[in-house]
Amino acid sequence: MSQHTPDLPPELLPLAQMPLLKRLAARFFGHGLNRLRAQHRASWLHGQADGFRSGHTAGVEYGYQEGRLEGLEEGRQVLLIRDSRNTEHRPPGVDDRLFDDWRLPLSAELKKRFKADVARLLPAAAQPSAAQWKMIFSDTPATAVIAGAGAGKSTSLVLRLLLLHHYLGFELDAMTVVTFTRESRKDFITKLTQVFALWGRQLGAREARELVRTFHSRILPMVRSLPGFERLQAFENLSDRLQSGEDEVDSNPFDLRINDAQRRHLNACYQALYRDDPRFRVALQPLVRHALQLKELERDHPDVQKRMAVTELAAKRDEELCDTVEDLWFRAGAWPIKGIEPQRQRFEINGATFHSHGYCAELDAWVVLGFDPRESPQLTRPGAKLTVRAEWAVKRTLFQAFCRKPLIWLDSYEASKRSAGAFSAQVNGGPGFDYKVKGELASAPLLDCFVAAAGFIENLGLEVGDAVAGMSFAQDDPDRFFFEALSLFWRALEDHLLDQSPPIMSYNRMFALFSERSPENFKLLSDACLRPMSHLMIDEFQDVSPQIVSWIRASLAAIRCRGAALHIGRAAQHSSLLCVGDDWQSIYGWRGSSPKYFIEFNKEFPSPGTTRVMLSENYRSHQHVIDAAEHIVRAAPAIAGKKAKASGEATELWPVQVLDRDDQGLAQRLAEHYERGDSILMLFRKSSDKLLIENVISQIVNVDSSLSPGSRRLKQLTYHSAKGLQADAVFLLGDCQHLSSSPYKNQVYRMAGLGKDGDAEPYDSAQKDEILRLAYVGITRAAKHCYWYVDRQEGPSGNAPKASDRVPRDKPYFQDLRQAT
């Protein structure tokens, strides 16, 4: 609003301030102006200015008061209606923790009392260290204990159990201690009963066996509690000998050897499937041809070069040679063979004509009979200069180098009997031939290969059919047909086993029934059946498989889902998980185990609180043994911050000696230690080495085996079998080497989410790390002395990764006595 100030006259006085005459005159003239209705301009302007001044002042004051009140009111309204909340729709989060948010009720007074009792009842050597007490008194739902070799974890686990049961009143049927093998289970039960007895608690054998379990002995009662499976048998436990219930749960599920009882079921399933499923028969044909077909030989091979010179001479005598060999097979009752039509077929070999003995229509392949090794090697045709065996060797070499047709070469009468089922659509037994999956070190009977491959896939938590569907192979790769046949066979085998009376099921199938893929099955379990999984303590956790991990997580989730109703009226409430392990001792990746679940424990087992304990004391070995083993394994991925310290009795530091393979030298050194009264472990990389070395240490073996079991001081085992053992002197025979690449295992490893992102060969990479861990396990068995004998590597295998590559020459804890190559 614009403001205007009018122009005022110079001076205009009020009447009261004027003299009388002027006042009278002003009134007169003013009255006249009124009568004339005229305006006195100066007076009007003066009045206007005076009114403007007084009106403006009053208006400003009034407007200020009015505007202030209105502004406050409007401001107050804006403040009240402003909504600063997030308008985006946000649903509740998912609670994926496996445990309730709780803590073990351990008061300071209880801890003090328990420590005093331990100091009073256990010898000084068995007193826990500070780290072990941290493990025993862990009050969080989840606890990960990194316990290196010789860390004294067993005693700590026993004291943890004692704390829960004796001092907190936890019922035994709410707890489970899981050990990895039958042997470790027996050892732990012995220690448990001894310690409990010191506190006046006599633990019965049955109670102890119910408490201390293997994974497999815990899952079996779960499945047997389901309707219709009360008498269920585990396929891995089948045997022709009578078994008690305890023998059954104590059997070794990791024994990959197929016994007669198991093979009968495999063969019966194979026969039915071969008879009824054309697709299965078609898938098998390339496998049979690949297995039985004569293996090719390069033409520049020395044997080929030598025998090419007599090609014409060999061709001239070939028909007579065929007659001679055929007569031998006929007299042995091995010819003719069902499914093979006896007929001669001519082959052009290096420009000359040779013959076969028959044709197999089922395989679309020609058949040649070989010279059975049981026949006399001096057998000679009339007038011939060479023996039949030598003539046949020449023919075999020429066929290997120059024959490109499908050809089956039967080397012996026994081989023909084993393979009889492969030649005919009428199968009366098993497949009758061996197969070698790429990446495996040796061939094995086909059905054994099926069991091993399916077991590996299922250990990774995968279904066989789904895994096979996700694989891919080259068009002509026989493994493509192997896995197609496996997929068909495995489903048929599971159906066949369930049809038996009583029904049969593999352990892997049992774990899958109660895995994270099938949470609804837990609704079928009673509280009493599920409750023992509430408070789990697991030893050797680094060797668990994805399948086992899925079962553990699903069980803990089911327990939390049931809530307080599962524990009404009981001292043991909620649930907990305590895992003890050493990722440096994870050595079972070849059958599907992985240290990933221990290394990434917090991620794999989400909990409101997790305690991490590092048991760094080593009560077994001196520092040189510890440092040598850790130097080898440190290149493998591991939990950060690991460094063991010798905590046993002070002793002289002997370096780990690395030597060239010398069986006589090994035997002499072993004898010296035995005569000194040392305990000895003789560890082999390959079981076949045991037979070789026993010849040179037979005298000591005989002396030791004549003693009572408790007095024996020599044990011979593979590296893998030695876990948990120790000796004064350890002899390692053989390097730890990664020799082959497995295409199918690399594929299923990726499917299972194992390995690093972007790694095309995750299984092979894991195995290269595992050979370092295997060497670590071998070395850390030694309390005082360790001798490592390795073969000189020649040929293609010499370039393969091996643990001894990491042996340094400039460290005091190693003494490399190998001759430089």
State the predicted function of each range:
Residues 7-42, 46, 50, 61, ...:
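P-loop NTPase Walker
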Residues 92-149, 154-156, 176, 208-215, ...:
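Conserved helicase NTPase motor core
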Residues 150, 154-157, 607-611, 617-709:
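Helicase P-loop NTPase motor core
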Residues 174, 179-317, 374-376, 385-445, ...:
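Conserved P-loop NTPase-based nucleic-acid remodeling module centered on helicase motor cores
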Residues 352-393, 415, 490, 557, ...:
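Short beta-strand-loop-alpha-helix junction that forms the active-site gateway
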Residues 396, 546-652, 810-817:
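Conserved RecA-like helicase ATPase core segment
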Residues 716-750, 786:
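A short beta-strand element within the Helicase C-terminal
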Residues 740-818:
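C-terminal accessory regions
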